[in-house]
């Protein structure tokens, strides 16, 4: 027994010692090492969270004129709380209209009916028959069908009981439930100071209502070039997954089109970051930072001049005969040897009760192709030289070509005997037809069948593609089309191809073509982004982050003497040929005019079936050491199916006036 008692005492002693040790450790944790363990707990429970979207980068033109800035917008928003019911949201809406001024006239009848439905479920249910409910069980009707039936059976008399206050609450309820349930709902932007302050100070007891400062874009030159600058907005539903993968939140504002979209990664701001600690406090670890600023190659004042000239000349042309289908013109001005776009404009005019009104359609310079006509004869001539179908200075007779069962194919006017330079100057179709037949290894005889080697199409298209025709120019914008590339390889179509009457090209493709000629065969990527600057907290530009260097896509595969000969031909166009005075006071210009048969969708039925005549012009100046290239295209300048022979020179006038204006602004010393 004494042994057992001794053991018990020993065990008791050990237990007491253990309790003392445990107690001492608790004292150390609670008093001596308290801060240490709090830090450990915080590190295990802290979460990094981001603040609201930061402002986007600013956009400038090449002369550092500010084009796009940010404007702070005070916003009231609603975030649905967990387990809130429709009835509770209705009550919340009635409460909040006391503090938020909303325009209930924007409320649609459908929205008001949905509000009535939430408040009168029993009555609405009674308006659905047993037979209709049975159809749901039989899967002849869906629950959505039943909801629509309920809505349809709400009468104007039901709604007439609603007061102005009820309608305000109904409109707020609609805003609270628009879109996905998990999304923040913008209730009001540009909130008043009183509204913003009240909700900011009381957000903890307003059931999901809160405030924030967001940013909207401010365009300092109005609509000038705005369509290319692009839009910003909420993430499109179809791109939700892609943006989430890139660490965006669904409430973020992103670039949706053109420059804003193309350079989203540069322009987007960096959100502030906070550590959310275990005690629900926030500690800022990095501040919000505006996105990088970008400088474009565009000269905004030149752009304004171009827009105004096109508008004026299009409206003038509509007073001329036979311009029924004329309603748009495109212009692109580039800088040779770099590819920079100095101005790019598309203008569309429509008639209204007060006359004509113009619209900006500049994005269509990348997607609206047309048959360019004779402007491509420089590339066609090069095919002839490269394949040895002709020699420099070769003389032939301008005479109509006749293929069996086909109409005669002639030049617009016969010149008689002519060489390659005169052929370009006078825009001889026949000269090109004869080259095409030689390239196609044809044995031509008047009014007999024409057989060609179809590989001739590939030979032509390869050379054309080296100028940017029939391929993407790789301009730094999200959308660009190739134009139409004909699949039929009939012999007469090869002849048509050689004079720009088969495949179609966009204005930007034609601009790359003439810029390649002006740059001695160097095909450059056309671009709008010129420089990127780090953001600052002032109105001044920050540190230069990087500058865009010209990108050479390829060189035209030809001999220097051949390209030089084409350039001489383009110079002759402007001195002795059909292009005299088309570039006005531009010094020593070179270029090429073009007229084509083209087809348009005149009645907007989706079918391109109305024959018209279109005009194009491409040029550059000065001939030696060019500083600019210009491309002007005007579809539908003439209706050929009338008894009126008048043809408007609107395309030439636009080219002349813009070229003159350019060199007035930027004279050559």
Outline where the language-model segments fall.
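Structural motif corresponding to the C-terminal cap of alpha-helices
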Residues: 309-318, 349, 443, 574, ...
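Short, basic/aromatic recognition patches
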Residues: 39-51, 302-324
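Beta-lactam-recognizing serine transpeptidase/beta-lactamase-like catalytic domain environment
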Residues: 66-69, 74, 273-289, 298, ...
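Membrane-proximal periplasmic segments of bacterial cell-envelope enzymes
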Residues: 1-261, 265-286, 329-330, 336, ...
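Short, gly/Ser/Thr-rich active-site loops of penicillin-recognizing serine hydrolases
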Residues: 539, 649-669
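Solvent-exposed, polar/charged alpha-helical surfaces in well-ordered, non-transmembrane soluble domains
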Residues: 90-94, 98, 197, 201, ...
């Amino acid at each position: 027994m004494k042994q057992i008692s001794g053991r018990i005492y020993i065990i008791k002693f050990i237990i007491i010692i253990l309790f003392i040790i445990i107690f001492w450790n608790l004292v150390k944790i609670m008093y001596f090492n308290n801060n240490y363990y709090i830090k450990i707990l915080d590190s295990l429970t802290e979460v990094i969270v981001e603040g609201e979207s930061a402002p986007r980068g600013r956009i400038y033109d090449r002369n550092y004129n500010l084009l796009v800035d940010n404007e702070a917008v005070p916003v009231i928003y609603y975030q649905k709380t967990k387990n809130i019911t429709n009835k509770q949201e209705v009550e919340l809406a009635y409460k909040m209209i006391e503090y938020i001024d909303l325009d209930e006239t924007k409320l649609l009848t459908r929205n008001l009916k949905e509000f009535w439905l939430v408040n009168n479920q029993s009555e609405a249910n009674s308006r659905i028959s047993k037979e209709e409910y049975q159809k749901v069980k039989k899967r002849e009707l869906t629950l959505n069908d039943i909801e629509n039936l309920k809505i349809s059976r709400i009468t104007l008399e039901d709604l007439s009981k609603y007061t102005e206050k009820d309608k305000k609450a109904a409109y707020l309820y609609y805003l609270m439930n628009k879109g996905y349930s998990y999304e923040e709902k913008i209730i009001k932007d540009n909130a008043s100071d009183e509204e913003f302050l009240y909700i900011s100070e009381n957000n903890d007891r307003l059931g999901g209502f809160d405030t924030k400062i967001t940013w909207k874009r401010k365009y300092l030159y109005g609509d000038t070039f705005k369509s290319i600058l692009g839009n910003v907005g909420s993430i499109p539903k179809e791109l939700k997954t892609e943006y989430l993968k890139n660490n965006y939140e669904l409430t973020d504002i992103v670039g949706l089109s053109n420059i804003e979209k193309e350079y989203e990664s540069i322009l987007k701001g960096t959100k502030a970051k906070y550590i959310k600690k275990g005690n629900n406090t926030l500690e800022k670890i990095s501040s919000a930072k505006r996105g990088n600023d970008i400088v474009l190659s565009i000269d905004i004042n030149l752009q304004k001049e171009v827009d105004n000239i096109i508008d004026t000349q299009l409206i003038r042309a509509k007073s001329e005969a036979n311009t029924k289908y004329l309603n748009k013109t495109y212009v692109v001005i580039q800088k040779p040897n770099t590819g920079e776009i100095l101005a790019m404009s598309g203008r569309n005019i429509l008639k209204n009760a007060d006359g004509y009104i113009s619209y900006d359609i500049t994005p269509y310079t990348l997607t609206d192709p047309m048959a360019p006509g004779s402007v491509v004869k420089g590339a066609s001539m090069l095919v002839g030289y490269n394949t040895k179908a002709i020699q420099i200075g070769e003389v032939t007779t301008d005479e109509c070509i006749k293929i069996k069962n086909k109409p005669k194919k002639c030049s617009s006017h016969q010149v008689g005997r002519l060489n390659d330079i005169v052929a370009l100057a006078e825009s001889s179709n026949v000269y090109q037809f004869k080259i095409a037949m030689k390239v196609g290894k044809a044995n031509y005889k008047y009014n007999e069948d024409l057989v060609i080697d179809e590989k001739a199409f590939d030979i032509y298209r390869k050379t054309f593609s080296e100028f940017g025709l029939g391929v993407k120019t790789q301009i730094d914008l999200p959308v660009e089309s190739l134009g139409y590339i004909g699949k039929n390889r009939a012999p007469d179509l090869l002849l048509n191809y050689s004079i720009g009457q088969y495949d179609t090209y966009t204005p930007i493709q034609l601009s790359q073509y003439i810029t390649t000629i002006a740059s001695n065969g160097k095909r450059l990527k056309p671009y709008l982004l010129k420089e990127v600057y780090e953001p600052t907290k002032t109105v001044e530009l920050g540190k230069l982050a990087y500058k865009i260097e010209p990108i050479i896509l390829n060189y035209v595969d030809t001999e220097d003497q051949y390209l030089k000969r084409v350039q001489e031909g383009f110079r002759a166009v402007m001195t002795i040929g059909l292009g005299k005075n088309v570039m006005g006071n531009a010094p020593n210009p070179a270029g090429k005019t073009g007229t084509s048969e083209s087809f348009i969708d005149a009645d907007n039925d989706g079918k391109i079936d109305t024959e018209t005549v279109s005009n194009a012009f491409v040029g550059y100046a000065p001939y030696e050491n060019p500083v600019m290239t210009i491309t002007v295209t005007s579809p539908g300048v003439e209706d050929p199916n009338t008894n009126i022979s008048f043809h408007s020179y609107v395309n030439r006038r636009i080219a002349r006036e813009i070229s003159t204006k350019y060199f007035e602004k930027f004279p050559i010393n």
